Structure formats: structure tokens, C-alpha cells
Amino acid sequence: MGEIRRLQIGNVTLENNLILAPMAGVTDLPFRLLCKEQGAGLLCMEMVSAKAILYKNRNTEDLLTIDKRENPVSLQLFGSDPDIMSEIAKQIEDRPFDILDINMGCPVPKVVNNGDGSALMKNPKLAGEIIEKTARAISKPVTVKIRKGFDEEHVNAVEMAHIAQESGAVAVAVHGRTRSQFYSGKADWDIIRQVKEAVSIPVIGNGDILTAADVIAMQKQTGCDGFMIARGAEGNPWIFAQILHYFKTGEELPKPTFEEVTQMILRHARMQLEFKGEYTGIREIRKHAAWYTSGYRNSSKLRGRINEVETYEQLEALFQEVCGDMV
């Protein structure tokens, strides 16, 4: 059986090795707090551009907001200029995050076309310079998130993990897909095993963790030290509690009832409104509500109605109306 245990990342001790992955547009403060309540051992923030912080882009402040209830929390920076990355790391070090993560895995074209994210998988030398300068600039632990490679012709996760370790990173997270795969197809867990066998720093496996059984299978196949959960948490912050319960008791928790799902959606919505105001908060909760209700009877019809909601009261009324039709 896989192992849920404490994990040491530099000078930071995680109570367990279940980690909420950084997801742009998903892992904002309200969602992170919900995952923390369900037992996540580490929360990763949405990625933020080092250049955006440098140029004082007003949209970055929400991305940098941390609540003391979250800790430990990992702040993820992306960029491809070693000087800017290290300078921004110094500027933000006093903020209450525990770990600084460097994004070398984002596959989104506008990020890659700027030489950032997974574009750095094609430039290991530059990647090493970024890690080294950033790790030297701050006292907080620095980690790196990478992919299997840029494409199937350039699979270099082992090389990148070596470089990360030699450059001062204290852990590496490996997504078992190439950049060209984006999020399609099956994650290659064997590349995680290869990285684990090649480096001495903790290796965190990422890709296709949807259940406790997946954690067991990944640990057995790869020997990885931690488990990073991404899409498995979308609409399902309970996944952390479900996995922890299974490892503690050997039994699966029952799936939340639709009433419990509804209460979570409404609570999540209230948190979004408090954090971002009604206009933005309601628009943010729409996608979450679609994920929460996915798989239920009439969920596709409900999704269309969710997207028309403009206020919290409308959202609450909608779920009161449809409750009986969904189960």
C-alpha cells in the first residue's frame, strides 16, 4: 500500500504528503481554504508572473493573497529571466508563504511563447541559472515543477531534476505528461519513477490522481515521496479527506450527498464573494459549480442555468429548485 506520511521540504514539515497542485484560475484563496479543511498537507497557489510583480500589475495582488489558516502554502512564480526571478523572490520573501515554487511545466501557449513555463524544458542551462539565482536570493526553500519533457522527442525530466537538485532546489514535482500533451492522454508514471531513482531530493508525483487507489498505484510504481492532486480536486475538495480516511481505516468514505454538494457550492460561493466581490465572485463560482455537479443526472442542463446566475440569491434559489431533479 502507498504511504501517507509527513514530508520534509527544506525546513518545512508537511503533516501529510497530499498536495493541492497549483492551477491557474482554480487554486485561489477560497478553494485552497476548502482543501485545507479537508486535510491537504500543502496548498499551492495559482502561478504568478515575476514580471507582473515587477511592473506592479494590479491583478497580481489577489494572486499573492495568503490567509494564515492556509500554512503551509507554496507560492509559484513563473518567468525566464534569472535576474528578475531572483529579484522578485527577494521582494516577496516577507510575505507569509512557506515554499517558493518555480513553474517549468505550464503548457499554455501565451506562457510558452514568452519562453516561460514548459518552454524552459527546452533550455536546461537557463533553467539551472533561474533555480540557482532564485535559491541563493532567499532563505525559504525553493522547489521546481516540471513535466516529462517538451514533447516525446525531447523527454528530459531526469536531466531537469538533476539540474534542479544541483542548482539548489529542495524538491521537484513531476507531471507525467509532455508539454505537447497538455492534459490529454495518460500520464506516464514511469518517468516519475526514473526521476525518483535519479535524485536524492523529494520527488512529488503529479498526473491522474483521482482516488486513494491511484495514490497506492503511483507509490507502488514510482516510489515517489508525495502526491500532487490537480484535476482530481476540481469540484471535489473532499478528495483529501477521502484519501486520508482510506489510508487510516482501509474503508472508503461515502460520496457526498447532493445536499452536501449544494451546501459546499453555496459556502464556496460566499467565500468567493467575500474575496472577490459579487460580480467576479459569481463568475468564478460558475465553473466550480459545474465541476461539483458533474456526473449527476441533468447536470449538463443545470450547467447552462448556472452560467446565467448573476447573484448569490439566484444561485441559492437555483439549487433549492433543482435539488430533487439531480438524484
Question: What does each model-identified segment do?
Answer:
Residues 2-8, 23-98:
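Glycine-rich, positively charged N-terminal anion/phosphate-binding segment
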Residues 23, 48-50, 78-80, 105-107, ...:
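Active-site beta-loop-alpha junctions enriched in small/polar residues
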Residues 18-22, 43-45, 73-77, 100, ...:
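Hydrophobic faces of well-ordered beta-strands that scaffold small-molecule active sites
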